[in-house]
């Protein structure tokens, strides 16, 4: 299934049904009086979170949604039936914005959660409502009220426990494929990953959801390479795995580029717990590993892990560190920098 994390939709709730003009006509009842029923209420438009979805691709092919008009009132004081609702099924983590794509309407984070986006118009009054002491046989009724019409943006922010960040070709997809059942595209060229992937990692009877987002470049927070869209997917993560490729000549610069983008993007991304790790160490000698690790530790002020997804070296240590930090963040409600021996 193709991935789409943003979509524009046009919705309209149903109009209310018209009230009826009707009079009671029965044998032996000379003056039956009015008995026109009210119109039914128009259908609503709802957003509903369902399980098993992780994309908004359906809304690329259908953008217009209109609920049904309420039924018209009938004689014998019968109210028209309510118009059928329209339900927009969305994945967990969907945010819905006004047409300006800035004003947040709702943030849907749990399966089964729903939100009414547009309320159907009320039905019109039948002629029974207009009877009074001076008008015993009113011949008027109200039309139903018009439904609401809105243009909305749907934006998906994946819900994961930990996120993988780094420059293109930092080995994020290879790491995800090695520790989960996810099958992201892996190749020896930049920007192999074009959209986020999710996988479930397991270690020591513990498990957590891991999100791999496409590589970040300078200017990502301003939308360069769609970086601002990708950064949104890690806003909900407890922990960030910041991977730096062992093949980078200047590992400190590679680290700082991504850190600068996190700070510029805002939303407290730069304050999240960070596990810094050098990937692809199977390409280095022991001496080269030591040099790059020491350089990064001086720049970050943190212990720096090293691993190889190809050889499997230190993969379990990475997962244990991630699982431990996720538990710590959840328990304490604060972010802490990882410390490894």
UniProtKB/Swiss-Prot annotation:
It comes from the Bacteria. GO terms for molecular function: GTP binding; GTPase activity; magnesium ion binding. Pfam families: GTP1_OBG (PF01018), MMR_HSR1 (PF01926). InterPro entries: G_OBG (IPR031167), GTP-bd (IPR006073), GTP-bd_Obg/CgtA (IPR014100), GTP1-OBG_CS (IPR006074), GTP1_OBG_dom (IPR006169), GTP1_OBG_dom_sf (IPR036726), OBG_GTPase (IPR045086), P-loop_NTPase (IPR027417). GTP binds at residues 166-173, 191-195, 212-215, 279-282, 308-310. Monomer. This is GTPase Obg. It comes from Bartonella quintana (strain Toulouse). The lineage of its organism: Bacteria, Pseudomonadati, Pseudomonadota, Alphaproteobacteria, Hyphomicrobiales.
